Amino acid sequence: MNAPVRVAVTGAAGQIGYSLLFRIASGEMLGQNQPVILQLLDLPQAQNAVKGVMMELEDCAFPLLAGMVATDDPNVAFKDADICLLVGARPRSKGMERADLLEANGAIFTVQGKAIAENAKEDVKVLVVGNPANTNAYIARKAAEKVGRTNPANYTAMLRLDHNRALSQLAAKTGKAVASIENMAVWGNHSPTMYADYRFATVNGESVKSMINDEAWNRDVFLPTVGKRGAAIIEARGLSSAASAANAAIDHIRDWVLGTNGKWVTMGIPSDGSYGIPEGVTYGFPVTCKDGKYEIVQGLEIDEFSRACMNKTLAELEEERQGVAHLLG
C-alpha cells in the first residue's frame, strides 16, 4: 500500500461535496492502492453538517480512508495537502450582479490561494470547481504566486463537466458508445460561452464531424445544449448539478494524476500563449496527461467559426479578469 495522499476539499458540507467525498474515499479518484486522508474545510456554521458527513464516511468502513480532519481554518485544511479540490464558492443569489459575485468569490479565493501556497505541498495539484471556476482559479493562482513555493501551472479550473456533457450529446446524436468517442476539445470559460469543438473527434478512427455532417445542428442545437445544460438541470431539478460536477472533478484529478494514455481531455489551465490565447488567462484547452503533468494538444487547425467562438469566450474571461483586478493588488 502507498503512503496516504492528503486531499483537501472545501465546501465539504455542500451538495457537490456530498457527492464527491464518498467516491474519493472509495478509491475512484486515485486508484485502489492509494489510501487518502480527507481534510475538510467549510464555514463555521457548517461544521456540524461536516461532522455528519464524516460520521457517514466512517460508517462506510472504506479500506482506503486513512484519516479525516474537519476545520473552518484554511491553514489547517491545506496543511501538507497533495491535492486541493476547491468546491466551496459563493453562489449567485437572486438579483445579485455578476460583479458582486466576482467580488465575493475574489475574497474567498485570495485567502485560499495564499493558504495553499503557505501550507500545502510544493507540487500540490489544485482544481477549482466553485464558479466562476476559471476566474476563481486565476485569483487563487495570483494570490499563491505572491507567496511563491507552489507551481502556478498547477492551479486549474474544471471544464471536464462541459467536456463530458459534449461527449454524451455526441453519443446520443451518432448512436455510438460514449466511451468510444475520442479527441473532443472544449475551449475557454466554464460558462455558456464555452466552445465544445468536435471537429477532431473520432470513433474508431472515423470522423464524428463527417458522421453528423450538419453545421446547423452544431450551431443551433449542440453548442446551446451543452452551454446551457447547467441551467436546464436547475430548471428540472430545482437544484444545480452536483453529482455530475463531482463526477467531472473525479475525472479531472484521476486523469491528471494517473495519465490519459494519449487520450484528450479538457482542463482549464493558465495559458502559455498557445492558439493565440494570451499568456496567464485560465482557459480551457484540450490536453493529454502523463506522469502527473498535462500538456496542451498542439497543431490543431482553427477555422474562422472556431476562432470567433474562442474569441467570444476569451472576451468574457478578460472581462471577468478586469472585474477582479482591484482585488489582486
Curated annotation (Swiss-Prot):
Catalytic activity: (S)-malate + NAD(+) = oxaloacetate + NADH + H(+)
Active-site residues annotated for this sequence: 190
GO biological process terms held by the UniProt record: malate metabolic process; tricarboxylic acid cycle
This protein's record includes keyword Plastid: no
Residues annotated to bind NAD(+): 11-17, 105, 112, 129-131
Keyword NAD: yes
GO molecular function annotation: L-malate dehydrogenase (NAD+) activity
EC number(s) stated in the UniProt entry for this protein: 1.1.1.37
Keywords from the named record: NAD, Oxidoreductase, Tricarboxylic acid cycle
Family membership: Belongs to the LDH/MDH superfamily. MDH type 2 family.
Protein name: Malate dehydrogenase
Origin species: Laribacter hongkongensis (strain HLHK9)
Gene that encodes the chain: mdh
